[in-house]
């Protein structure tokens, strides 16, 4: 091969390498951009889910609230018992205001909220692609209450039943 042929081959190789490198860089940026967009969409979805959860809780729509519990939380109290206890001991109709969402440990997202000046932290995580509320992390004291006999539960909360 002559000198001109070698220069042509070298030029093609360098051009091809530059093209591949450029494609890799663009792919990296695109996947990063896609990951950022997906994370933003996921956070937006969580915000909507948590807002619905809080609104239902404030309205005493207890079945839909329990439905958003994760399996660990649903194992603590049955849906029927949760609904019954909350129907007989309703909460005031004020929903907390979401102030932000932050990344927590072990795949949980923390929905930061305020309610009448009290700061609350609800822990949510994806289960099968759906945001689910974790009672044990969000409100550990509720677990002890739900395990009490009904009469003691109502007495402890000052409810009539």
Q: What do these predicted regions represent?
A:
Residues 2-55, 67, 152-154:
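Short, low-complexity N-terminal intrinsically disordered segments enriched in polar/charged residues
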Residues 3, 12, 16-17, 23, ...:
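Intrinsically disordered, low-complexity regions
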Residues 39, 47-57, 63-108:
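Short solvent-exposed beta->alpha transition segments
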Residues 57-59, 114-115:
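Non-cytosolic beta-sheet module surface loops
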Residues 91-92, 100-161:
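Exposed beta-sheet edge and beta->alpha loop/turn motif
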């Amino acid at each position: 091969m002559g000198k001109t042929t070698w220069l042509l081959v070298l030029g093609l190789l360098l051009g091809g390498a530059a093209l591949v490198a450029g494609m890799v860089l663009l792919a990296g940026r695109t996947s990063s951009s896609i990951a950022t967009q997906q994370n933003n969409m996921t956070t937006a979805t969580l915000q909507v889910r948590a807002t619905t959860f809080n609104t239902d809780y404030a309205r005493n729509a207890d079945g839909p609230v329990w439905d958003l519990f994760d399996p660990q939380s649903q194992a603590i109290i049955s849906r029927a018992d949760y609904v019954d206890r909350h129907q007989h001991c309703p909460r005031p109709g004020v929903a907390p205001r979401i102030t932000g969402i932050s990344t927590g440990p072990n795949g949980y997202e923390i929905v930061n909220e305020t309610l009448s000046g009290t700061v609350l932290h609800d822990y949510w995580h994806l289960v099968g692609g759906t945001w689910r509320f974790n009672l044990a992390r969000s409100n550990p004291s509720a677990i002890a209450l739900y395990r009490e006999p009904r009469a003691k539960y109502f007495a402890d909360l000052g409810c009539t039943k």
